[in-house]
Amino acid sequence: MKDTYKLILGIDPGKGGGLAVYNEKENETKAIKFMDDLCELSAVVGSIIHGFKADEIYVIIEHVHSFPTDSRPSAFSFGRNLGQWEGILASYELGKETVAPKTWQNHYDVPIIKNKYERKRWLKEIAQTMFPDIRVTLNICDALLIANYAKEMQYYKKNEKKGRKK
């Protein structure tokens, strides 16, 4: 019987973001920060896809957008980073789902924190608790939590389909 398993890629597409990969077969998660060199980043994604030979690759990327208070260069940077990720994923014929920041953060009961730095520190602490074997940084904490969110949501969906006893 063939051993089937899934990879989950969680992506924080911000310039200071990262990529987390959950390997269902090994029950292991790894993460890297976003690289400035797109060729290198694309090669890393390719090595993940071709190296693991998973039966299914599920990609979830944070749905980012600019705010009216953002400067034009900042808004452009948001769109460019997301577009770069979309291009890399498309080059490997990978579809994606998006998740709003509020959606995945609510999964971890993150309070509403207006200050971005304080919110990132809060998220980093959650990720450090969940992934004690990983050196969690501000760059990769969101990606780790997004990948874990996707893993947990798929677990819940799978069990709902089977039907739970009440």
Predicted regions span which residues?
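Phosphate- and other anionic-substrate recognition elements at nucleic-acid/protein interfaces
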Residues: M1-K166
